[in-house]
């Protein structure tokens, strides 16, 4: 993950209710738990014992953050989440949500870490998170992802067996893009954001929103809809059974 600053507000939604936003950040991150994966071998981690080979290196795990990957700063009187990106992982709400409107604002920092020194900065909003931490690449829970990456905010990624239906079209056999009005297709791999896209330059604040209701979700960037997913669900590894995924952390 490569996000520097992140402001979070959440609202629960009802069929005929106006949203009431609830701040999700405080200085102690009291509404969240941390999970961190395997630190890159290019730097030392206090108190961390590596395995005999890179594949045997253990995860840092739950609420163990010796490098302060996740901290809160106060900017203009408001708590702002600072993520260094030095270790892949996630910050997960303690509470589960089903129907909600999540509104975030973020801007990028300048520093990068191995293994992404030459890659674009990358993060994501993962929602409907269920199951065990680390199910996806030792870093994330099973979930749906709204990608927050430089140049690709609003792409959809499935984590640990998640899948959806979406209105998409193929581009050049390489890109599957969200296209409003296109036929729905069952998807288990990346869906690129739509062409109505307006990301702000690095260093400026972008507003990213996720609306989730009854298993569907809408991703918006700076007031524009960039992706829509339908019928959130998942499959266990090796199974063809599809299980509804409408709520989670």
What name fits each language-model region?
Residues 1-2, 223:
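N-terminal export leaders
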Residues 16-249:
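Carbohydrate-interacting regions of secretory-pathway proteins
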Residues 2-14:
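Sec-dependent N-terminal signal peptides
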């Amino acid at each position: 993950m490569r996000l520097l600053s992140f402001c979070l507000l959440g609202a629960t939604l009802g069929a005929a209710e106006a949203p009431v936003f609830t701040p999700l950040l405080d200085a102690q991150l009291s509404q969240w738990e941390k999970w961190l994966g395997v630190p890159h071998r290019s730097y030392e981690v206090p108190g961390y014992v590596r395995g005999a080979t890179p594949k045997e290196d253990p995860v840092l795990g739950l609420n163990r953050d010796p490098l302060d990957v996740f901290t809160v700063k106060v900017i203009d009187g408001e708590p702002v989440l600072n993520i260094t990106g030095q270790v892949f992982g996630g910050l997960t709400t303690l509470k589960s949500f089903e129907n909600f409107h999540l509104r975030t604002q973020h801007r990028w920092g300048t520093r990068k870490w191995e293994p992404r020194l030459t890659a674009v900065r990358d993060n994501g909003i993962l929602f409907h998170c269920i199951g065990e931490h680390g199910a996806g690449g030792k870093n994330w829970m099973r979930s749906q992802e709204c990608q927050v990456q430089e140049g690709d905010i609003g792409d959809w990624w499935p984590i640990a067996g998640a899948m959806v239906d979406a209105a998409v079209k193929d581009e050049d056999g390489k890109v599957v893009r969200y296209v409003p009005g296109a036929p729905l297709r069952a998807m288990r791999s990346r869906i690129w954001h739509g062409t109505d896209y307006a990301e702000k330059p690095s260093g400026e604040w972008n507003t990213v929103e996720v609306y989730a209701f009854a298993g569907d979700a809408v991703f918006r960037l700076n007031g524009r809809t960039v992706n829509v997913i339908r019928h959130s669900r998942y499959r266990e590894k090796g199974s063809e059974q599809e299980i509804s995924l409408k709520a989670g952390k």
